[in-house]
């Protein structure tokens, strides 16, 4: 078997390792942020860290092992990656509104962010 016929175990190792580190850090900072204070702002940031970490985990799987997956599996993993990154950005927007409104969230803001997310998808 020649060198060109061998399949790599991980196809994009640096990108995958970076994504896996982001997953670990996202989980750590998510847990840490949730334990800080009992506020809506910190709750939203904690959720955002967890969601971004999970998106990074899926991105690392896709970048590292994606060529071994079927076309459908690749699309599903990448779609879920983008969904989790989008949810994370919406959480950050929501935390901004919570900060501006003295730790409270208006239903109108949630509806606007929901439709904004639908445009993203």
Specify the residue positions occupied by each region the protein language model found:
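Internal transmembrane alpha-helix with an interfacial aromatic "cap," most often the third helix
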Residues: 27-34, 59-108
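Long, amphipathic alpha-helical coiled-coil segments characteristic
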Residues: 17-37
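Aromatic-anchored segments of alpha-helical transmembrane domains
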Residues: 54-55, 113-121
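Hydrophobic transmembrane alpha-helical segments in integral membrane proteins
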Residues: 2-24
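Juxtamembrane/transmembrane-helix boundary motifs in multi-pass membrane proteins
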Residues: 6-10, 38-39, 73-74
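Hydrophobic alpha-helical transmembrane segments of multi-pass membrane proteins
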Residues: 18-22, 44-66, 88
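Membrane-interfacial loop-to-transmembrane alpha-helix junctions, especially the N-terminal start
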Residues: 38-52, 103-112
